[in-house]
Structure formats: C-alpha cells, structure tokens
Amino acid sequence: MNVETPRLEIHIDRIAHNASAVISQCGAQGIRVAAVTKVMQAHPALLRALEGSGCVMLADSRIDNLKRIAEAGLDLPTMLLRAPTPGNAPEAVRWADHTLISSYQTAEALSNAAGMAGVRHKVVMMVDVGDLREGVWPDRAVEEVSRIARLPHLEVAGLGTNLACFGGVIPTREKMEMLVALRDECRSATGHPLELVSGGNSANLPLLASGEMPAGINHLRIGEAIILGRNVLDRSPWPGTRQDTVELVGGIIELQRKPSVPIGRTGQDAFGNTTHFTDRGLRLRAICDLGRQDVAPEAIEPVDPGIEVLGASSDHLIIDVTDAETPVRVGSEVRFLPSYGGLLSASTSSHVRKMATGRP
C-alpha cells in the first residue's frame, strides 16, 4: 500500500512510554508535571499518548492549541504558557485554567475578562532568574504579586520561572532556592497560599536526577524530554526514554550519480547563503519531497547512518545515499529523526501529513 509523503509518523505507544517514565521520575520527588503539547500543535495523537500518563495538566503556548485540547475531551486542567495580550485575555480565560503572566497589565485584563465570564481565573507569576525571557525581575516580584493578588477575579496560584530557552541558562539549586524563597516572601506579603512553584521545563530534569532539586519546587512543564526523549542541555538520550518517537518520512523523487561540487560560477543560494562544497568526486545523490518550507535540513538526522543530508531548497531535500545501508530507488522512503526545532516546523507545515501509529 502506498502512503503519501512527506509525512510525520507519530508513535503513540513510544511517547506514552516516555511520558510515564519522565512523570514517574518527577513524581518520586514530589513534583507534578504539566505535559507541554506545543511542539506538535496539540495533535490528537499526542494527546492520546499523554492521557493516563500521570500528568496533572496539559500546557501550550497557543490558544488555538488549547482549543484542540478542549475538543479532544480530556479531563485535565490546561495551562497557557505564553502570556496573552490584553486583547486576547477573554480567549485565554475561556480556554485555559491557568495562565503564566509577567505584568500587572496582563493580570488586570485577565481579571476583567474573568469577571465578564463569571469565573475566577488562576495565574502564575513568572520570575526571571537569569535566562532573560519572560518574567518580572526578582526584586520586584513581591510588589507585583501583591498588586495582582488584590484583583477581584484572579487567584495567584503560585510562581514560576523559565530557563535554558532564550539565554540557555542552566537550572541550578541556587536559582530554584531563589524562586522558593520569593514564593515564601509573596505568601507572607499577601496571605495567599501560592501553592504552585513551577521550576521550569525539561532542562530541570538533570538537576532533579542529581538529587539537588529543592523540596519547595513542586511543578515542572515538560515537553521535549517526553516527546523526543532528550536531555535538553546537551540533546543526549534521557534515561529510560526512547528517541524514535516521531519520524519524518520523505519520498525519493530523483536518484542520480552527480559531481559533489557545482559546475560554474556560484553566488548565493535561494536563501541568501554562500555555500561551500568539498570535492568528493561523483556521488549517488537523491532528492526527497521535503524542503525548507517543511523543515530545516540541519534539523533532521537520517535513520540510516550511511545517508548524509547535504542541504535543501524550498521544496527539495538533497541527500547523499552512496553509503546507504539499505539500497534506494525512486519511490523509496527515507526516514529522519527530527530535532525539537525540526519537529516544530514539520508539525506546523500543512504540507506534511500527520499519521499516528501504535496505541498507548
């Protein structure tokens, strides 16, 4: 049976295995997990893999993805990871149970929207402990939380932070202790319990595994370690997980032996880059029906170790198959393991078919 390419094969059973492994590791140290779905746009196959995994909530950065979670009918609370603009506050209140925020203006808009909807909305105040993405600076946290706690239709559920995303800052015991101490100060200043202390994302797992995670951290937002089974600090395999959870499959549309260096004067390629080539003589090269419109060539790794990705234009992926372990021909399929960035692109591309396999 012929199956269309390009396609993204989502192995539900393998992701479910990873989810159970990672969530069990966290649970052993009293940490609850919000499973992050954004890299795959909250695809139903991913949601099926996460259902019953032990996660306490589902988290995403996009309101549209939270809608998909609601439509799937999963009985889990949701968390909006990216603060909404004031104009999007009503939608945030409608589709999220918790929202991460970092400014009073956003909190005020959420409170107004919650009042209009007749609900009480939970917010988590983000504190920037050094990665320089979102979050109030630590010396302003108590003041900001105290102001927000007075808004009529909000509940400040706790504090959170984010590391190893923009600045690549590695989570440490000291940074986690700072967050716990700030929570305690905010609790004293407001009289609110602020029970949730969300210490970060998959980057916190090595600290957890080392036994150095402070007891006050009770929540993490985990995506890549579950979906791709990677230690995000160095992309090595995370213990107890699989890395073959999602495969990008392309079909070969041309197979020819060609020189390894272009012939003629060269300038920039279609994307404004100047490319350098090494003369390796004649090589057997294949073109797959994938391109940069679907995924960056540097963000995928062939499953066959003898295949090498050479580059891509918008719609053509060029690979060297001279040393392929499995012979290929026009019409053959080539499998690739995507990085986090590669999976993000392929999941977003409407040109890549998504196909679920296996059962949780």
Q: Would you name each region that the model predicts?
A:
Residues 1-10:
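Generic N-terminal amphipathic, Lys/Arg-enriched alpha-helix
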Residues 7, 31-174, 181, 189:
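Active-site-proximal beta-alpha core segment in soluble small-molecule metabolic enzymes
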Residues 15, 38, 69, 125, ...:
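Conserved, mostly hydrophobic/aromatic
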Residues 18-21, 28, 39-52, 65, ...:
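N-terminal capping/small domains of soluble enzymes
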Residues 128-247:
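Active-site loop/helix belt of alpha/beta enzymes
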Residues 205-288, 294, 301-302:
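Active-site loop ensemble at the mouth of alpha/beta enzyme cores that anchors a bound cofactor
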Residues 259-360:
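C-terminal accessory subdomain/extension
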